[in-house]
Amino acid sequence: MGTTEATLRMENVDVKEEWQDEDLPRPLPEETGVELLGSPVEDTSSPPNTLNFNGAHRKRKTLVAPEINISLDQSEGSLLSDDFLDTPDDLDINVDDIETPDETDSLEFLGNGNELEWEDDTPVATAKNMPGDSADLFGDGTTEDGSAANGRLWRTVIIGEQEHRIDLHMIRPYMKVVTHGGYYGEGLNAIIVFAACFLPDSSLPDYHYIMENLFLYVISSLELLVAEDYMIVYLNGATPRRRMPGIGWLKKCYQMIDRRLRKNLKSLIIVHPSWFIRTVLAISRPFISVKFINKIQYVHSLEDLEQLIPMEHVQIPDCVLQYEEERLKARRESARPQPEFVLPRSEEKPEVAPVENRSALVSEDQETSMS
């Protein structure tokens, strides 16, 4: 019965659908007889000028966040409490089990704006017309260390406010030419060891290209290793003539060294000096300052060098040690007294009469012949 009456009432009601904002009040349509929530209202031509605070409105559902105690203690509700530290067992990490990279897994390179980069066989590389670019370096499509065939390892350095690139692949066998020999005195006074025996042979086809890149490597190494005052120990022993650096190369090194490095150089010790290195320095006097010439010091043995600098961290090549032993052996043999040479008695010559006695004998013979 009630259902039938409700149906008859709904047939007489004209329902019009419209979009209504939930919270913002707006004028009701003129031809509506139903309130938003279904309660009948009077049809008025003027919009309402008051808000209905007593009527039923739709309310949004508000989510209340749980109370969190932001503190560093482990009390209940704190961020450091055990309630927030529940993690599955597979996420537990033991720091001791983490493997650290080996020294061989990383490339050693220096800072101060220097950076390593790989350059493939690109037009930039081929345009430089460098030795070995026309074909593989070893002819079998692989490099010396088994890496990419057309890849070269480069280092970008800044020398004298100019950017240069060093071909590390070409100078790799000669990098031992410059080493750090520790410190002397108080502070960071570095000892730079230059071993001439590790220089390339002048008969190599790419000798000038190698020396140019090796020159940049030596200069950049000095700028990285030197912090304050320093000295250079030049190991000249066991170096054949074909590996001696030329005058032009030494002149270029001196001219491109930064003024700070030239000023902070306190001594240049030349160990086992040869006549060639003395001649080179004598010829180089016109373009070398007098202050630099006064810093040169000659040392003839490693024993004398030990009296000047600490030798704990100075790496002496094996060929230089062997050269030192040969020199000491030759010096001992030359200092040994030589035995006097005495003729045996059977080989002794008969005594010769003096000149006066000989003239007397001649006169006696003449007298006997005249008589």
From Swiss-Prot:
Residues 1-54, 331-371 are annotated as: Disordered. Cleaved by CASP3 and CASP7. The potential C-terminal product released by CASP3 cleavage may inhibit the ERK signaling pathway through MAP2K2. May be ubiquitinated by STUB1. Keywords: Cell projection, Cytoplasm, Disease variant, Mitochondrion, Neurogenesis, Synapse, Transport, Ubl conjugation. Residues 11-29 have a biased composition (Basic and acidic residues). Residues 190-371 are annotated as: Mediates interaction with GLS. GO terms for molecular function: kinesin binding. GO terms for cellular component: axon; cytoplasm; dendrite; growth cone; mitochondrial membrane; neuron projection; neuron projection terminus; perinuclear region of cytoplasm. The record marks 105-106 as: Cleavage. It is found in: Cell projection, Axon; Cell projection, Dendrite; Presynapse; Mitochondrion. Residues 42-53 have a biased composition (Polar residues). Residues 171-328 form the CRAL-TRIO domain. Residues 115-120 are annotated as: Required for interaction with KLC1. GO terms for biological process: apoptotic process; mitochondrion distribution; negative regulation of glutamate metabolic process; neuron projection development; regulation of protein localization. InterPro entries: Bcl2-/adenovirus-E1B, CRAL-TRIO_dom, CRAL-TRIO_dom_sf. It is linked to Cerebellar ataxia, cayman type: Found in a population isolate on Grand Cayman Island and causes a marked psychomotor retardation and prominent nonprogressive cerebellar dysfunction including nystagmus, intention tremor, dysarthria, and wide-based ataxic gait. Hypotonia is present from early childhood. PANTHER family: BNIP - RELATED (PTHR12112), CAYTAXIN (PTHR12112:SF9). The CRAL-TRIO domain is known to bind small hydrophobic molecules. Interacts with KLC1; may link mitochondria to KLC1 and regulate mitochondria localization into neuron projections. Interacts with GLS; the interaction is direct and may control GLS localization, negatively regulating its activity. Interacts with PIN1 (via WW domain); upon NGF stimulation. The interaction with PIN1 and GLS is competitive. May interact with MAP2K2. Functions in the development of neural tissues, particularly the postnatal maturation of the cerebellar cortex. May play a role in neurotransmission through regulation of glutaminase/GLS, an enzyme responsible for the production in neurons of the glutamate neurotransmitter. Alternatively, may regulate the localization of mitochondria within axons and dendrites. This is Caytaxin. It comes from Homo sapiens (Human).
